[in-house]
Amino acid sequence: MSHVIEGLVETSCNLGILRTDSDIWTGVVSLRSSRQDQLLAMKEKFYILSGMNQIEMQVFSEYPGWEYREESALRQRYCAVYQRLFGKEAGIEAIHAGLECGIFARAIPDLDIISIGPDIVDIHSPGERMSVSSVQRTWELLLAMLEEEESAAGERA
């Protein structure tokens, strides 16, 4: 669990697939963490356990962590634009999920990143659904953020 955000799962692993083929067992484990150091530590534990038990382990793909930053100018601007557009405070939520933001954060460590999107429920299930009106709000918010950034860039020039 996160020591920074109450209730947030920080690191987890999931045995998603277990197959048998003759005398060969294959397991597919998904590791996930918002902290890259914890992800690497968990992967190392799997290597140690597999070595102790004469099990071959292969890494097929990796998804980098995206650690929450307490200070974010972009998040502050987002909250201000959200307040101006919708007349209420933006809901800020950290989630335990693999997001593409981690890929960008690993490639450009100082990049200030936020993730926004429409309201989606029952993700990755047969009942998954999305609020169409929230898609419209997200679009309006994105346009307003880009317009504000364009204005700020013009003032800096």
Kindly give the residue locations of the regions a language model identified.
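Short, low-order "capping/linker" segments at domain edges
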Residues: 1, 68-84
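Generic C-terminal helix-cap and adjacent flexible tail
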Residues: 147-157
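Short, solvent-exposed amphipathic alpha-helical segments in soluble enzyme
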Residues: 32, 44-49, 107, 130-133
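Acidic-enriched catalytic cores of C-N bond-cleaving enzymes acting on peptides and small amides
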Residues: 1-12, 46-52
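FAD-dependent oxidoreductase catalytic-site/capping-region signature
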Residues: 43-61
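Short, conserved charged micro-motifs
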Residues: 36-42
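Zn-dependent metallopeptidase/amidohydrolase metal-coordination segment
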Residues: 10-12, 16-26, 85-146
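A short beta-alpha structural unit
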Residues: 14-18, 26-36, 55-75, 102
